[in-house]
């Protein structure tokens, strides 16, 4: 049996020469989030044609046109907006980021005059209790979710260092100058947005609260005002593993990069944010049509410098000026062909984008995991692996795919939910009373449910539990039929890619029926030589299809 090694090097090698021009343009399209002028759309709308031709990554919604504040752009009422976002999703061939600036206070696209709830500014919230802030952000998150928004360019984690700062401090967009307060209230918003499957985008890296200028209008130099303390909110939140996306600022700081503003700077985005702060998520630019950038760099320069600096998603709001998606794609495509942008960087950004879509699509449905079940798990580890452990955390190194042998989702869930083994599992009952479990359960329609933390041990495979993540699939009727669906296949592929990116320690992906191939490996810990069962799940064809897809 071939043990599948899911490594980035292999993936890139296999794909290095197989990319067509059309495929490349679609990958470029995935890296774009753009504004468009319509409050309603149909199949003839330009944004729909762009989504379908270029696999557009996302859109940003505004209530008004920047140059004509009396003219409605994308938002007029809750009902209208909900229909618009529904249509956007239905027309888009791939998962779409539908984004908005909804910080609260002065920066809020969903306003009471359109029928939405009012959200206080960050400064106002900072004078409240954390509990009150949670209630406020819960209400806002529900409003965003109901409207079909899945990405919010908030919270603002800029420190209010300069009282003369107009664009952040003057507009009450900062929670203040106290780092702990900024972190606490930012977490409050992020927590509520996460519960509603809304991506939080921290901004404006590396800090805009000390500036005197407005990057919307022109060049902003913070070389003499910026302080390293402005990095601390990012450092703290990144270390907690809570940050999926960060927006760059168009500020210039000669102490870090003597040539380029942060958005276009490798020193800021890769060396500082990626390498020093260890950020693994997505980097999105602030609007590349702002004066701080557009007045000094051509479109080709803006896009190529940003991508090479480490930016994954390019934002063009089409408020300050207008540019077509076709022109954006063709400009970047030309830069790639000229060798000014690496194809591998395009691939890497696309992989991160798809992984984030997978993450926000996962439904949380926890199984019962009381202290009793944890104690049973520790006893299992002691009995079968001869390890004394303080907790049940693991380092994932393998993903094992299964089927439940049950055709109904709820019955499959109930089989995994109980703490104690069911009476019909005589084949493994002597080994432990601990019930079987898995980290994920994939329904017939491809919906992924997370049942327990990925880094806790589940009982799902003999010998390898202590280093593996288990993925169960509803199906495999009576343990005889290879009947898992195409939707489940696609979901498993997406989930494997997401988990591998999250846990670089994962090197192997196997079917449950292949587990005995590991008996002589260092990962195998089972001490009972008689404790083995024969397995057929999730089917040889299913595993072959998964591997073929991962190889492409």
What residue spans do the PLM features occupy?
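Sec-dependent N-terminal signal peptides
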Residues: 3-13
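N-terminal hydrophobic targeting/anchoring segments and the immediately downstream early-domain regions
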Residues: 17-112, 311-316, 362-364, 394
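Hydrophobic faces of well-ordered beta-strands that scaffold small-molecule active sites
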Residues: 30-36, 57-61, 96-102, 151-155, ...
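Second-shell residues forming the walls of enzyme active-site clefts
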Residues: 42-46, 59, 71-91, 96, ...
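Surface-exposed loop and adjacent secondary-structure segments within mature catalytic domains
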Residues: 112, 140-225, 514-530
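Acidic, His- and aromatic-enriched active-site or binding-groove loops in soluble protein domains
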Residues: 121-132, 170-192, 220-235, 528-552
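Basic/polar, cationic surfaces and motifs that engage anionic cell-wall
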Residues: 144, 366-374, 480-552
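N-terminal catalytic cores of peptidoglycan-degrading enzymes
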Residues: 364-461
């Amino acid at each position: 049996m071939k043990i599948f090694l899911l490594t980035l090097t292999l993936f890139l090698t296999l794909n290095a020469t197989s990319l067509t021009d059309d495929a490349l343009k679609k990958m470029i399209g995935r890296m774009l989030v753009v504004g468009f002028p319509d409050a309603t759309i149909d199949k003839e709308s330009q944004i729909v044609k762009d989504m379908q031709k270029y696999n557009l990554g996302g859109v940003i919604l505004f209530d008004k046109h920047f140059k004509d504040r009396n003219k409605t752009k994308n938002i007029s009422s809750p009902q209208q907006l909900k229909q618009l976002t529904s249509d956007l999703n239905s027309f888009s061939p791939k998962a779409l980021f539908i984004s908005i600036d909804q910080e609260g206070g002065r920066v809020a696209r969903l306003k009471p005059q359109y029928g939405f709830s009012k959200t206080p500014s960050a400064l106002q919230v900072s004078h409240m209790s954390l509990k009150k802030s949670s209630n406020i952000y819960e209400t806002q998150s529900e409003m965003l979710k109901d409207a079909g928004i899945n990405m919010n360019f908030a919270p603002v984690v800029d420190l209010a260092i300069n009282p003369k700062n107009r664009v952040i401090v003057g507009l009450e967009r900062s929670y203040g100058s106290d780092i702990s307060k900024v972190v606490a209230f930012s977490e409050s918003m992020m927590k509520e947005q996460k519960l509603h499957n809304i991506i939080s985008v921290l901004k404006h890296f590396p800090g805009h609260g000390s500036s005197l200028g407005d990057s919307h209008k022109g060049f902003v130099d913070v070389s003499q005002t910026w302080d390293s303390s402005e990095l601390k909110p990012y450092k703290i939140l990144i270390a907690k593993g809570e940050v999926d996306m960060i927006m760059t600022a168009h500020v210039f700081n000669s102490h870090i990069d003597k040539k380029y503003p942060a958005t276009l700077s490798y020193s800021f985005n890769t060396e500082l944010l990626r390498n020093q702060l260890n950020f693994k998520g997505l980097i999105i630019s602030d609007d590349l049509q702002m004066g701080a950038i557009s007045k000094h760099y051509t479109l080709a320069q803006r896009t190529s410098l940003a991508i090479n600096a480490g930016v994954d998603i390019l934002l063009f709001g089409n408020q300050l000026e207008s540019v077509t998606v076709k022109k954006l794609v063709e400009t970047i495509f030309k830069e790639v062909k000229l060798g000014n942008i690496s194809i591998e960087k395009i691939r890497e950004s696309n992989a991160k984008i798809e992984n984030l879509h997978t993450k926000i699509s996962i439904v949380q449905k926890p199984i019962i995991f009381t202290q009793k079940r944890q104690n049973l798990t520790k006893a299992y580890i002691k009995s079968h692996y001869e390890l004394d452990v303080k907790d049940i955390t693991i380092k994932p190194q393998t993903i094992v795919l299964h089927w439940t042998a049950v055709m109904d989702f709820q019955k499959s869930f109930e089989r995994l939910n109980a703490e104690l083994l069911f009476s019909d599992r005589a084949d493994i009952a002597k080994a432990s009373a601990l019930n079987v479990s898995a980290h994920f359960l994939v329904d017939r329609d491809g919906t992924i449910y997370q049942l327990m933390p990925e880094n806790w041990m589940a009982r799902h495979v003999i010998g390898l539990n202590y280093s593996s993540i288990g993925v169960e699939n509803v199906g495999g009727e009576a343990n005889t039929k290879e009947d898992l669906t195409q939707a489940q296949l696609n979901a498993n592929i997406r989930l494997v890619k997401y988990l591998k990116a999250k846990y670089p320690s994962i090197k192997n992906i196997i079917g449950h029926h292949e587990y005995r191939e590991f008996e002589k490996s260092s990962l195998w810990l089972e001490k009972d030589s008689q404790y083995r069962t024969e397995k057929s799940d999730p089917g040889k064809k299913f595993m072959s299809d998964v591997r073929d897809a991962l190889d492409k």
